[in-house]
Amino acid sequence: MLLSADDKKHIKAIMPAIAAHGDKFGGEALYRMFIVNPKTKTYFPSFDFHHNSKQISAHGKKVVDALNEASNHLDNIAGSMSKLSDLHAYDLRVDPGNFPLLAHNILVVVAMNFPKQFDPATHKALDKFLATVSTVLTSKYR
């Protein structure tokens, strides 16, 4: 999915605020995904799935850090996430259907925490960005 110049502007504007609290926002998105879609817990057999779990927060930070890194390479998201794509496809073998589920929950968390900044243009841009990241992360499955 091609990101327009306007999309890139909105992504660049909101990602630093998200990244500043990656453990909180990423953890909340993962927690929501685990509650709403329990089958996604399969890949985390040793996790404590309670709200504000340190394990979920730590993994949430990894997710947000990866998204922040991708946001610094909006013209080459595939290149910047190639190693992560390999990891998820070949080593972890994560169900590719989980990425859109997490993307949806990230949008929910961002909307809740940044209601003024999460206008329709930012919503569209972040949705396109997360869809692109999901596509990149599943590209090695084929």
From Swiss-Prot:
Q: Which residues bind heme b?
A: 88
Which residues belong to any copy of the Globin domain? 2-142
Q: What InterPro entries does the annotation carry?
A: Globin, Globin-like_sf, Globin/Proto, Hemoglobin_a-typ, Hemoglobin_oxygen_transport
Tissue specificity annotation: Red blood cells.
- What UniProt keywords apply to this chain's record, in alphabetical order? Heme, Iron, Metal-binding, Oxygen transport, Transport
Gene3D superfamilies according to UniProt = Globins (1.10.490.10)
UniProt lists the family membership as follows: Belongs to the globin family.
* Protein name according to UniProt: Hemoglobin subunit alpha-1
Species assigned in the record: Xenopus laevis (African clawed frog)
